[in-house]
From Swiss-Prot:
Protein name (Swiss-Prot/TrEMBL): Argininosuccinate lyase
Enzyme Commission number(s): 4.3.2.1
The protein's enzyme class: lyase
Lineage of origin: Bacteria, Pseudomonadati, Campylobacterota, Epsilonproteobacteria, Campylobacterales
Catalytic activity: 2-(N(omega)-L-arginino)succinate = fumarate + L-arginine
Organism of origin: Sulfurimonas denitrificans (strain ATCC 33889 / DSM 1251)
Record GO terms (molecular function): argininosuccinate lyase activity
Length: 460
């Protein structure tokens, strides 16, 4: 018999069709989930009296042998078997005989692959969460050392207001916390079992879907079989979650690339996580963050690809959804190595506070503080204070100095209401620590934020 479904066909499938139709060379990644799902299904069938105890024992032992063969590398994956389900079932039947032919009772490949793929995605949601926690812990280690390290905060990539380096890193902790929450939310929402839905409409066999759901670690069985066998929201969600996470990684990577340049010198990546040039001997290139930026686009492509596959599929299952796996596999693997290498690159990175502080003396970072002084101390409306401060900035430009270094006499020429106490407002350090509102950049508020993220990770 050529194919397990070949009964109604009079001709053998062409080798070209085998090559085009087969998914076995990539969906075999799901062999653990497939074997575990089959054991759970067989266990339920035996409890329901559809299989005998002896048949269950044969199937369980046979599947264990198949698993050992796969993991030892002796299992032969054949294109002609079409997919891993058929490959494993054919090998099982070759080992144990007729009992293997009974395994597929009350089951379709439609619900079988939905179980396998869903369980893989659920597992990867949690593994990525664990990797994100490790990354956040590493960022916390760095941030805890730099709550007083001055850094120019920017908008439009222009110097805006002074902040501290830990506060800047805390912004990424916020992003990665949201990523964790998205993965965890997806896990909870999608933790339902498709097993027993069969092709699309359930089965007349007296099965127990709740039993298999419990055996496989699902929260419950799904509600509607028609939806369940064709649902790939769980795959789209992990792709979206990874895409969003990679976007956050890419933003940090962009800053690492800039900060490691001679124009900034805020950080230096270690030799272990840098590369050189084939022609320019002096080069030390930030290939890790550059590749992280590039791989973000690759993950986006997987998300858009699956969205496009799914956008016009009628209910229920269609072969189009075979195209769901490679993009997810690739995105997951990209996410895993990206999180690991970013963590290690940060761990070995050298922070250069001196250059960060020097950069705070460029761009008149205390301009807003002068405006605030005029409002608070001189009772000047903010819009007028904004205009006066602009004049002070222009004067500083004329003098070729930073606003934080301007002498009182020049400020009084602009507005005589300005007094000597303004100089404390213009201090870069004081400016950073003046922002004491909740979520602000003062050292005290930054330390509160770091404690918040530390507690978040402890509670997870």
């Amino acid at each position: 018999m050529d194919k397990m479904w070949s009964g109604r066909f009079s001709a053998t499938a062409s080798s070209l069709l085998d090559q085009f139709n087969a998914s076995i060379m990539f969906d075999r990644k799901l062999y653990r989930e497939d074997i575990e799902g089959s054991i759970a299904h067989a266990t339920m069938l035996a409890k329901q009296g559809i299989l005998t105890t002896d048949e269950l024992s044969q199937i369980t032992k046979g599947l264990s042998q198949v698993k050992e063969e796969i993991e030892s590398g002796v299992f032969e994956w054949k294109i002609s078997d079409e997919d891993l389900h058929m490959g494993i079932e054919k090998r099982l039947t070759a080992i144990i005989g007729d009992a293997g032919k009974k395994l597929h009772t009350a089951r379709s490949r439609n619900d079988q692959v939905a179980v396998d793929f869903r369980r893989y995605v659920l597992r990867k949601n949690l593994e990525i969460v664990d990797a994100l926690k490790l990354l956040m812990n590493e960022i916390l280690v760095i941030a805890s050392k730099h709550t007083q390290t001055l850094l120019p905060g920017m908008t439009h990539l222009q110097h805006a207001q002074p902040i501290n380096f830990a506060f800047h890193l805390s912004a990424y902790l916020s992003m990665f916390k949201r990523d964790i929450e998205r993965f965890e939310s997806s896990y909870k929402r999608n933790n339902i079992s498709p097993l027993g839905c069969a092709a699309l409409a359930g089965t007349p066999h007296k099965i127990d879907r709740d039993m298999t759901a419990e055996l496989l670690g699902f929260e419950s069985a799904s509600i509607n079989c028609l939806d369940t066998v064709s649902d790939r929201d769980f795959a789209l969600e992990i792709l979206f979650n990874i895409s969003t996470m990679m976007m956050h990684i890419s933003r940090l990577s962009e800053e690492l690339v800039m900060w490691s340049s001679y124009e900034f010198r805020f950080v230096e990546l270690s030799d272990e996580y840098s590369t050189g040039s084939s022609i320019m001997p002096q080069k030390k290139n930030p290939d890790v963050p550059e590749l992280l930026r590039g791989k973000t686009g690759r993950v986006y492509g997987s998300l858009m690809g699956l969205l496009t596959v799914m956008k016009a599929l009628p209910l229920a299952y269609n072969k189009d959804t075979q195209e769901d796996k490679e993009g997810v596999f690739d995105a997951v693997e990209t996410a895993e190595i990206s999180l690991e290498i970013l963590k290690e690159a940060l761990k070995t990175m050298q922070v250069k506070p001196h250059y960060m502080k020097n950069a705070c003396k460029i761009g008149h970072l205390s301009a807003t503080d002068l405006a605030d002084y005029l409002v608070q101390k001189c009772d000047i409306p903010f819009r007028e204070a904004h205009f006066i401060t602009g004049k002070a900035v222009a004067k500083s430009e004329e003098l070729k100095i930073d606003l934080s270094d301007i002498e009182l006499k020049y400020l009084k020429e602009i507005d005589d209401r300005i007094n000597e106490d303004v100089l404390a407002f213009l201090s870069i350090e004081n400016s950073m620590n003046a922002r004491t509102s909740a979520g602000g950049t003062s050292t005290k508020r930054t330390e509160e934020q770091l404690k918040y993220f530390e507690n978040f990770l402890k509670a997870e």
